[in-house]
Amino acid sequence: MEKKIAVIGAGNLGLSLAKGLVESKTYKPNQFNLSRRRIEKLKNMAQDGYNIYNDNVEAIKNANIVVVAVLPQKINDVLDELKESLNEKHLLISLVSGVEISSIKEIIGSNIPIIRAMPNTAISIRES
């Protein structure tokens, strides 16, 4: 089964991650569901073959991996929005600085696996 990655918060860091994984030939653009509040900023990504969404719940529906790359002050709202749709098929990866795994578990109240990672935008050129 082909892996599908949802990137919630496809801004600088989220897009850098997606581009870096595609550049490395590990994934193809169509394996990414990119979500962002201002979806018009993802127009070029759609032209490159990425799936784009302005609905976070829709973005994670067919994903195995959910990467959360939002600003720290937005994480509670985003996790509240996603928690009913997250299940045991998902792996949640948080790129949000200053937010511990225990805090995420407290919000989502689920037993899904959670990983915390801290790449930087150099990941887009596989240097992070």
Language model: regions and residue ranges:
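Rossmann-like NAD(P)(H) cofactor-binding subdomain of soluble oxidoreductases
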Residues: N56-K61, I65-V68, P72-S128
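NAD(P)+-binding Rossmann beta1-loop-alpha1 motif at the extreme N-terminus of oxidoreductases
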Residues: M1-N54, E58-K61
